[in-house]
């Protein structure tokens, strides 16, 4: 399994729509960086957030109550305030169409990590298609800004030595084609 370089990421995005919109170079002046890097792509967070609150006393991933989260639009301010010790969901600006022989792993940016903001995203499986739902935690005892339309995490691409027998698309993955923030789902 090989880690893919900037030239491969660029070709797959421009010729096959793997990442759209695609920024061919890293943008980093006066913003948290995003765009193509040497062996990855820095994704941007959109301006819509869902802040988890304590309206109900329990989060159940098998039976998630949407009332446990409040939608917040940060497009006017340009940032979202994540309260101390809080958790929110967001989504990428970029839409992904993963090749069948490639898996992507997403890691939070050090700029946020150094402020106690932890970003988690599960792997982008072969032939996954959609916007990425991003999980954001503030591990500090202070409120923190998360900047909309700026970098939030880096994606690295790993190409398999052989083609998988069954992709995410083949098995009808429950988050296939997701748009915007997607809450937890259980197939029934």
Swiss-Prot record:
Its EC number is 3.5.4.13. Keywords: Hydrolase, Nucleotide metabolism, Nucleotide-binding. The keyword Nucleotide-binding applies. DCTP binds at residues 109-114, 154, 168, 178. It catalyses: dCTP + H2O + H(+) = dUTP + NH4(+). It holds the Pfam family DCD. It is an enzyme of class 3 (hydrolase). It comes from the Bacteria. The active site is at residue 135. One of its GO terms (molecular function) is nucleotide binding. InterPro entries: dCTP_deaminase, dUTPase-like_sf, dUTPase_trimeric. One of its GO terms (biological process) is nucleobase-containing small molecule interconversion. Pathway: Pyrimidine metabolism; dUMP biosynthesis; dUMP from dCTP (dUTP route): step 1/2. Catalyzes the deamination of dCTP to dUTP. Belongs to the dCTP deaminase family. Homotrimer. HAMAP family: dCTP_deaminase. This is dCTP deaminase. It comes from Helicobacter pylori (strain ATCC 700392 / 26695) (Campylobacter pylori). The lineage of its organism: Bacteria, Pseudomonadati, Campylobacterota, Epsilonproteobacteria, Campylobacterales. The gene is dcd.
């Amino acid at each position: 399994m090989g880690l893919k370089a900037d030239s491969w990421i660029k070709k797959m995005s421009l010729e096959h729509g793997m990442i759209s919109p695609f920024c061919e170079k890293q943008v980093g002046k006066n913003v948290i960086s995003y765009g193509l890097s040497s062996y990855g792509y820095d994704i941007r967070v959109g301006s819509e957030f869902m802040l988890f609150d304590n309206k109900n006393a329990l989060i159940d991933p098998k039976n998630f109550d949407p009332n446990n989260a409040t939608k917040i639009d940060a497009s006017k301010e340009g940032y979202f305030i994540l309260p101390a010790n809080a958790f929110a969901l967001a989504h990428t600006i970029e839409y992904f169409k993963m090749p069948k022989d490639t898996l992507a792993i997403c890691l939070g940016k050090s700029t946020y990590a150094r402020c106690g903001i932890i970003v988690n995203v599960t792997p982008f499986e072969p032939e996954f298609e959609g916007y990425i739902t991003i999980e954001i935690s503030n591990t500090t005892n202070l409120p923190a800004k998360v900047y909309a339309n700026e970098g939030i995490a880096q994606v690295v691409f790993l190409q398999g030595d052989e083609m998988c027998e069954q992709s995410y698309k083949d098995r009808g993955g429950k988050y296939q084609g997701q748009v915007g923030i997607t809450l937890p789902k259980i197939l029934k």
